[in-house]
Amino acid sequence: MTRVKVCGITNRSDLDTAVDAGVDAVGLIVDVDVQTPREISPQQAAELAAATPPFVTAVLVTMADVPDAATELVEAVRPDAVQVHGESTPDALASLGAAVEADVIKATDPGTAATYDGHADAVLVDSLDESGAGGTGTVHDWDRTGELVESLQSPVVLAGGLTPENVADAVEAAAPFAVDVASGVEAESGQKDADAVSAFVDAAGGCQ
């Protein structure tokens, strides 16, 4: 069964919406070098992480420098996992993983995903901008991601331009460990739509 992460949770209402829809993970965006309505403060993220119920993974999503700044942020927010965007070496990721009690996910593009295989608990394959940030809302080559699923040891999370309308095709093409969505389930920028979240979860799971 492909797991589902809804990223860019900014408030308790949207957290409840995602949990009620049956998501497996929620993303809390803190300390990123891009303008996004989904970014929240470390304190807000810590409150939402603490409110996330058992069996739902709270994921800190950040561009903080690895390992030092990212380690401090993980200690402040106390998530179940940390998803790292931007430039970082495999050794830096390993240092982060050794320093925190959280799984480490590396966001990357299809061309560089293999670099981080085995150095992170999972790799998230996204359509990244020049800064290494995701959230572009752009679809990439799902067949290429499927090849990574077959060749990498690390679990592969598929992100980039996913919606309730196309996620079933994406899962069929790539068979990822999980799919990740943000803008594709929003009624307006930064605000989740309950119907869209439920439809996304149903579509991602219905094609198994």
From Swiss-Prot:
Reaction(s) catalysed by this chain's protein: N-(5-phospho-beta-D-ribosyl)anthranilate = 1-(2-carboxyphenylamino)-1-deoxy-D-ribulose 5-phosphate
Keyword tags: Amino-acid biosynthesis, Aromatic amino acid biosynthesis, Isomerase, Tryptophan biosynthesis
SUPFAM superfamilies: Ribulose-phoshate binding barrel
Superkingdom per UniProt: Archaea
InterPro entries reported in the protein's UniProt record: Aldolase_TIM, PRAI_dom, RibuloseP-bd_barrel, TrpF_fam
Pathway info: Amino-acid biosynthesis; L-tryptophan biosynthesis; L-tryptophan from chorismate: step 3/5
GO biological process: L-tryptophan biosynthetic process
Gene Ontology molecular functions: phosphoribosylanthranilate isomerase activity
Disulfide bonds: none
Top-level EC class as recorded in UniProt: isomerase
EC number(s) on file: 5.3.1.24
Family listed: Belongs to the TrpF family.
HAMAP family: PRAI
Name by which UniProt lists this protein: N-(5'-phosphoribosyl)anthranilate isomerase
UniProt organism field: Natronomonas pharaonis (strain ATCC 35678 / DSM 2160 / CIP 103997 / JCM 8858 / NBRC 14720 / NCIMB 2260 / Gabara)
